[in-house]
Amino acid sequence: MFWNRLEVDLNTSIHTPELAMSSLPMLATLIVVASTAVAQTPVSSQPKPADTEVWKPVPAIVTPGRTNADPPSDAVVLFDGKNLDAWVSARDGSPAKWVVANGVFTVDKPSGDIRTKRSFTNYQLHVEWRVPENVTGSDQARGNSGVYLAWVNGDGYELQVLDSYNNTTYVNGQAASIYKQYPPLVNAMRKPGEWQTYDVVWTAPTFNANGSVATFAYVTAFHNGVLVQNNVALKGVTKDVGLPEYKPHGPAPILLQAHGDPSEPVSFRNIWLRELPPR
């Protein structure tokens, strides 16, 4: 607009001789001011690749296991095939009495559930389990156990263990379900006698000072390498009867269930986890 006006002024001066001489000082001043304004107008900065490059903190180096099932260098090994030193009775804290043989341990139903000595918050968990080939029973009374991802004062969040190979039951109680909350996305069960794997990412809930929920617990789980729980928000601790609900807690142990059904007991091996930072 400024230059258009200047052009008009110049044209007027040129075609009006009596104004030409008197307008020259003003025109010179306008040209100087316009040139200065153009020179001082900042050139818009262009984005550079370096603007979005993050260099620190540098991720820690972790040496992976020989296979995806083997513990990486930063893993906490909970069962290495030798003993149950990392576990105690959930009933009274005494040494775990489940049977260890040939690199495997098997549920001892009379002695009850076992839990880890240590407590954890957020983690990546690897568990291998097997329903015996000669398993009998049906529905929930067939190879039943459970991995409680956090166990607090008699309550916990259960990832179901069950023979779900040609065994009909309610879908939020089959293998790889978040028990009584979320059915698995698919049934990835191998037949009895074959080893199953669970790989789980557990994000613990957090609580406000008054005990209310600040953030929900979240679970992502793979059964035999197949995604079965996709970052689901848990509704609370597992309830066999009634609706799930939250109770405030901090770090908690992991529990393995000795289910009271009469079927042949489940076995476990190769259990490890990696502790994860807060979200």
Give, region by region, the residue ranges found by the protein language model.
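Short linear/disordered segments characteristic of secreted peptide precursors
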Residues: 8-9, 38
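Hydrophobic residues within membrane-embedded alpha helices
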Residues: 9, 19-22, 33, 43, ...
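Bacterial N-terminal signal peptides that target proteins for export
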Residues: 12-28
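Hydrophobic h-region of N-terminal signal peptides that target proteins for export
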Residues: 30-39
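Carbohydrate-interacting regions of secretory-pathway proteins
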Residues: 40-279
